Amino acid sequence: MSGHSKWHNIQGRKNAQDAKRGKIFQKLSREIYMAAKSGGPDPDGNPTLRMVIDKARSNNMPKDNIKRAIKKAEGGSEEHYDEITYEGYAPGGVAVFVEALTDNKNRTASDVRVAFTRNGGSLGATGSVAYMFDRKGYIVIDRSTTDADEDQVLLDVMDAGGDDLQTSDDAFEIYTDPKQFADVRDALIKDGYKLADAELTMIPQNTTPVPADKKEQFEHLVDALEDSDDVQNVYTAAADED
């Protein structure tokens, strides 16, 4: 692993998104609906649904909202969303990978294109930056919730089938092969760990510092993409701030 750490960035993004919680719930409902529709409504038999429900809970999504999305899928709704990705560069040459769930591809493509062009970025062709990212399972343990030291956590992670452990003052960050993600997550929970975050994500192989004079524009681009109702995830290769 390149040493790229996500946890502080995730915390910062979640804090910044408090004012957008309604939109976040809308996006999570869409993910839950599609996961339940494609893999069944029982999270015990549908790892994707379970992962999305865990993600919803970590964002304090009300239980009733989760149940409604699942019932909508059970009820045979004809509503359908396509999974689409977009790739490009932010100001300063930082690679950006966008995942969307949409019922109108033209609308989403237009929204994404406008976000890039109005904020100093450039939308690229399919495959232009995807190769710069690796799909990984990502799990976080808040150090304040466990008495285990780094050696013990590393042992448990390796026993569970995890690939890598990174530590900071406040968290243990675990990376897994995507196919092993659910097994590693379940094993760590069984070992008694409380997980602060658990998701499938995209990790940049290398990172690019955002130039000081491009930082505001870069942040505006990410915000514009995340403001789109259809965009589910925005991944960048921006270097962590010191």
UniProtKB/Swiss-Prot annotation:
Lineage: Bacteria, Bacillati, Bacillota, Bacilli, Lactobacillales
Name listed for the protein in its UniProt record: Probable transcriptional regulatory protein lhv_0777
Annotated localization: Cytoplasm
Region (Disordered): 1-22
Keywords, alphabetical: Cytoplasm, DNA-binding, Transcription, Transcription regulation
Source organism per UniProt: Lactobacillus helveticus (strain DPC 4571)
GO molecular function, one term: DNA binding
Gene Ontology CC, one term: cytosol
Classification via NCBIfam families: PRK00110.1, PRK12378.1, YebC/PmpR family DNA-binding transcriptional regulator
Keyword Membrane: no
Gene Ontology biological process terms, A to Z: regulation of DNA-templated transcription
Main location: cytoplasm
Family the entry assigns: Belongs to the TACO1 family.
Stored Pfam families: TACO1_YebC_N, Transcrip_reg
